[in-house]
Amino acid sequence: MSDSISDSKSSELLNSTFYSSTSINTLDHARTFRNSLILKEISDQSLNSSIKPCESVLDRDVESSVLQRSFGESNARDSEVQTVNMTTSPSLSALADILNERSKYADQKTRKAQNIESSIIEEEEEAEEQNNSINYHEDITGSRLSVREEANENLAMTSPNLIDIDGSNSIQVAPLSLPSFEEPDFLSTPRVKPDSQGPRSKVSTRRTILERDNNLPVKREENTIINSETESTTHSAPFLKEDPKPSPPSSKLYNPKVRLNKAEARKYTDSSAQRTTSAGSVLEDTSMHKKKKSIFSFLKKKEPKPVIGNNSVTNEKNKMSSSSTFSMNIQTSLKTPEKLKKKSHSSSSIFNSFLKGKIETSDSPRKEPMRQKKRTPKSKDKKQDTEQIIDAASVLSTESPLLRKNHDDTPVKIDHVTRSIDQRKPTPLNMDLILGGDKQINTPLQEHVREDDDAKNDLQLPTKDNFLSLDYEAPSPAFSKHDTGEVLFPKFLDNHEVDSIVSLERTRSTKSNKRSSMNSQRRSLTDTLSIKAQSEGMFITEASSVVLSTPDLTKSPASSILKNGRFEYSDNFSREHSYEGTTNEDFLDIKDDSGPLKKDDIFLESIEQKFDQLVMASDEEKTEVERDVPKPREEPLKKDSERQSVFADDDNELISDIMEFASFINFGDDDLNLDLDLGDTTASYATETPEPVGNDEVNRSGTFDTRNNKEDSYKERETQSYSAAGATTYGDERQGQLHTFEQDGSEINDNEFENEDFNKHIEQPIEVTPRNNAYLPEFEPNRPVSMSFKGLKAPRMNTSFIDSMTPDSPVKSDLTSLGEVYVNSNNDQGVRFSSQIILYDTYGEFEYDRHPEISTCNQLTPQLAQMIKLELNELKSAMEVHDDSRCYTHFY
């Protein structure tokens, strides 16, 4: 805005009635001050002066606040400022807030309007430079300037009262509504038209827009030039680029790393690059380039249909390659570089982004008219001289490296350029054919193979004339929907494919780590035990390689281990005996080795089957276990009828109660240390005539059995019978043993062994086998295997330590003690341990969860705990404990 306008504004502001000394009303202050800011006289004048092309428009400061510009500039004038006193009015603060809000809204409106005006002015300057260089200044300049002058006059006439804020050469324009020629195309048209109808109509419109600009120089060319063979190729370059500048800016634009994608984006990129070279500020030219492109795209769209007739008439008159043919094929075949495509994607033009999406989806309908136009220049190029062909090729080579493929006869270096451009192309669906080799760019035969899949939508095989239009076409719709100006990484994978690959690899690594950790855990456990055991003279062997069955955790409590697994008795004991048969030197002392071991092996298997039957609660297995009992042991069963009344009187309810709290009770086998005479037990073996066991002694053992485990009852029954009768036979012992297990299978509850553990059953043969002396302390069954051998140092395999009381007695293993009665060997008392450790495989931490459920812990109340304590104390007080062991009994 000129200085005269600023002076008139300030004079009107200071001479208003608001500044008289007689007015003290605050409402009058606000009203007169507001009216003084709206200057009706200078609106049209300042708008017309700002429309004139001036270089200072681009340098204005848009970000300064409105209030500073309105008050600060008026205060920065002459000495007239001293007459303004704004501190006495109480309404100035409220008025300042209102004006600040309204000025912000007006500033947003004026920025949009000034962007449009500056883009029109800049486009006008470009058009003038272009017309002066190509010698048709009169036609184009007159047409374009007339359109812009009419638009500027419409803006000046239809604009409302404006607020002149600062005194520079720029002006803030606040239009109430956009001009009529801008509103429908800029905002409404892209939103109304659907996508399904878009491709065909949009392609024809877009093609005529480009042809219309390129036909104007063709009409001028007919009237002025006679021999226009070389001039047509020379003129095609300026229409492609809009500025006839030398090669340095074009080489900057057509970097081999850059690929153009759309005709309109390429066209405005050229002009912006030329302006960047000529103008001083690169940043301002780039921003103006975005705004100019948005307004120029719909100004060219007005009258497409009459221009089509001019193009056809021009081609028929000349019968030669017109500039529109070359420029049409060049612009549609070129691809937008991804860096420049990001600039165009970030533009504020809604219509431009909508048009880019339409052009991208309508590449296939555009191919067919391009091929028809392409055949004409190829036929005419053959008639030209060699010098003219080379000249045209050199002109075109400075502008677009992609045009070098049209001239097959000229030795142009296109290998590096096209390959580098092709590497940055988005991935098409026929990636396997494109990646076949590096020679596919040079040889036309491989380009035929490459373009077969691209031309399927046109139902037309690729010919020699349409290599340019097919070779660098847009990507397929599957990839173009993701290609919105952003660089996809990795290049040849979709985002969904990358996510699926990442999740798949993560799942595989998790599974493999879980398997390896479980296996390494078990191996490391075995190796650790082996190292410790070998240092103490023991050896560890795996029980079996049979895979354990998966536990059913829903049907068993968390504390039950026996309920979740089954015995691998056939493999375990066969491996155990075969291993000991080859390495145990104590087996060599046995005279009859095969017979007793086979019988004892069968007997051990029957014991394990019995445990398995009690766990699984199968009636069929009960009968099988009873059938599996060895035949030589069936003779002592004749006296079972005498002992049927023993367990018939047992209190089954008491047994079930004991088994219910079996996990809390340690009955303590070591506490049952009966003070028996050693001479009586040795004399019992000396007597050869068996004596029957009395019924009263059997009843004693039966009553004791109801309050203890079955192992304890059998052991106590043996010791009672030995102490009372003095001697017994092996048949009676076997008879009592078989009687115990048959009564367990018939009358004892199946849940009796719910809380037993594996370690106790592994040591079961030690408990049920008859001992030579009742005074021998029994092995503690509740201790695990690893604790049982802790601190033992055997010199070699299968040798055992002798009890301190009997240091000179021979040594036997536990399994050989099963056959000592058959061998009739005289052995003294002693505790024997095997140096072989059998490591049974259990469930890992990932397969079996030992943590109890939270609901179980929450159900335990103080009253329930007190009841459990009283019941356990009562149960312990009712036990038959030796008098010497009473002091060791623990009560809760």
Curated annotation (Swiss-Prot):
Biased composition (Basic and acidic residues): 208-223, 357-371, 624-643, 707-719
GO CC terms of this entry: cellular bud neck; cellular bud neck septin collar; incipient cellular bud site; protein phosphatase type 1 complex; septin ring
Transmembrane segments: none
Keywords tagged on the record: Phosphoprotein
Positions carrying Phosphoserine: S43, S133, S281, S364, S394, S476, S500, S503, S618, S746, S825
One annotated GO molecular function: actin binding
This protein's name: Protein BNI4
Organism: Saccharomyces cerevisiae (strain ATCC 204508 / S288c)
